[in-house]
Design a protein with these regions (language model features):
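N-terminal Rossmann NAD(P)H-binding glycine-rich loop of SDR-like oxidoreductase domains
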Residues: 3-22
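NAD(P)-cofactor binding segment of oxidoreductase domains
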Residues: 50, 64-90, 114-115
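NAD(P)H-binding glycine-rich loop region in Rossmannoid oxidoreductase-like domains
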Residues: 41-72, 96-99
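C-terminal substrate-binding subdomain of Rossmann-fold SDR/epimerase-dehydratase oxidoreductases
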Residues: 151-251
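SDR active-site strand-loop-helix element
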Residues: 6, 29, 50-54, 89-95, ...
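Conserved Rossmann-fold NAD(P)-dependent oxidoreductase catalytic core, especially the SDR/UDP-sugar
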Residues: 78-106, 123
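NAD(P)-dependent short-chain dehydrogenase/reductase
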Residues: 102-106, 110, 114-166
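Adenosine-cofactor binding site in Rossmann-like domains, unifying the SAM/SAH pocket
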Residues: 25-42
Length: 251
């Protein structure tokens, strides 16, 4: 396939790019290349598929700058959807969309899903909490792996490994008859406090979801089965093992 991938230099996009290039021709658009989806000229190319991962993430930053999240997650997506209205589009959403009234980030993802529902060619991928060996800097999982957490919260989260996300996307690429919005996660929830001990406990804030757990039954019908789970991953990380991208094996 000839695929357009937005956000190809991001946390998920950079790994997805490597996986896609094994079997497809991929063109990337990313803000790090100076290509802002709000203003850039789109490639004058016929694509078989658009995978839209670009956008802003993070609850706390969205509270400080809600307009940026609206512009980057909603208006930029609107422009992309209109440009490629005759092309199949798979786009990244978030489990935060379940409770859009909690914060601007959640609201932007909810509106994104509502916007996409107006187009018959779209498929939403509602990612839950994604982690990997190389997490985003200064985010929760980065601090956890590097023993820099100062406290834990009372939240419950469905943690899904980056490579399970990549596998799910590859499955959905082939499932050309699927549309709507699908949950992508591990299908299991974990109490944050159970991941690390002997740290102060911070009560949950009203701007974040207390509990998340992906309903992956529809994904399982398509052949998706998560391979990695957070507690086993942390145990392997302490042993110095590394999960390889292309093989999914632990070395």
């Amino acid at each position: 396939m000839n695929i357009l991938l937005t956000g190809h230099k991001g946390f998920i996009g950079s790994s997805l790019l490597k996986a896609l290039e094994l079997n497809h021709t991929v063109t990337g658009i990313d803000l790090l290349d100076g290509k802002d989806l709000l203003t850039c000229e789109f490639p004058n190319t016929k694509f078989d598929l658009v995978i839209h991962l670009a956008g802003r993430s993070g609850v706390r930053e969205s509270i400080n700058d809600p307009s940026a999240y609206w512009m980057n997650n909603v208006e930029a997506s609107r422009r992309l959807f209109e440009r490629y209205e005759d092309t199949r589009i798979m786009y990244a959403s978030s489990s935060s969309a379940y409770e859009p009234d909690l914060n601007p980030y959640a609201a932007s993802k909810y509106v994104l899903e509502e916007l996409a529902s107006r187009y018959s060619n779209t498929l939403g991928m509602r990612f839950h909490t994604v982690y990997s060996n190389t997490p985003r800097k200064n985010m929760f999982f980065d601090r956890l792996l590097n023993n820099k957490l100062e406290y834990v919260t009372t939240h419950y989260r469905d943690f899904v490994h980056l490579f399970d996300i990549i596998n799910a996307i590859n499955i959905l690429i082939e499932a050309t008859y699927v549309n709507g919005v699908l949950d992508i996660g591990s299908g299991k929830t974990v109490k944050i406090q159970d991941l690390v001990s002997n740290l102060p406990i911070l009560m949950s804030t009203p701007t974040e979801r207390q509990y998340t757990c992906a309903n992956i039954e529809k994904m399982k019908v398509l052949g998706y089965e998560p391979k990695y789970f957070i507690k086993e991953f942390l145990t392997n990380s302490k042993k110095g093992t590394i999960i390889k991208l292309n093989t999914g094996e632990i070395a």
